[in-house]
Amino acid sequence: ALGGLAEKYDLKVIEDAAHALPCSYKGRAAGSLGDVGAFSFYATKTLCTGEGGMVTTDDDAIAERIRTMRLHGISRDVFDRYQSEKPSWYYEVVAPGFKYNMPDTAAAMGIEQLSRAKLLRERRQSIADYYNSQFSGLPIDLPPAAATGDEHAWHLYVIRLQGINPRRDEFIQALADRGVGASVHFIPLHVQPYWRERYQLKPDDFPVAYDVYRRCVSLPIYTKMSDADVERVADSVKLVLASFEQN
């Protein structure tokens, strides 16, 4: 649908694939579904360089435009200090630009991890599979599964507590008391002070988003978790839920 609209109105499709490396959707790699794909390599992402990210495209003109914009609008053609006849200190700004270039050290870490990207995803998949098997039948909603033939990145593993009073904050604290760190992803924008005050919003203005927020808990899922770590998280979740049912 988006592709058809883009073609009709001569638009470019930018795909937010921040968490999706190295997954595929309907046989196509994440980041290749539009004209441009954008990935994040922040510390919590499936491939990490500390900071930074990656842009993919098969359009040479877009690629060159991105290369120029990422470093203050400096053209790589005129910034080649090793082949140009101009002095080494010389450069030209050919367009408005930004400071978006990744440090070489971060890029080197990312290139090395690319060779292990599928292996890292498979470890996350195995953790998610274990959680799913352990949590089946409990009073929680499990994360949506990927469609047949597609892949899930498992950047996060988010459960939703059931019931009229989900007691989410108590649940997270009870896990913490057992040495299991859990978090919430994410807090809806309409309850954040800036948007709430600017647009005079109330929590119930977006009831579905607010209800999911009240119930959601992100459990630990990262590639360096040992099997014992994963089992301890699952056991702790079951014990805390059992204690809630008794109170």
Residue ranges of each PLM-predicted region?
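PLP-dependent aminotransferase class I/II
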Residues: 1-3, 8, 24, 60-247
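Conserved active-site segment immediately N-terminal to the catalytic lysine
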Residues: 10, 15-49, 89-94
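Acidic active-site catalytic centers that drive phospho-/nucleotidyl reactions
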Residues: 15-16, 51, 104, 220
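Histidine-centered beta-alpha loop that forms part of the nucleotide-sugar donor binding/catalytic region
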Residues: 18-19, 42, 51, 67-71, ...
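Ser/Thr-centric signal marking residues that sit
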Residues: 32, 44, 56-57, 218, ...
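Short beta-strand-to-turn element immediately C-terminal to the catalytic PLP-Schiff-base lysine
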Residues: 40, 53-58, 111
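Short active-site oxyanion
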Residues: 51-52, 117
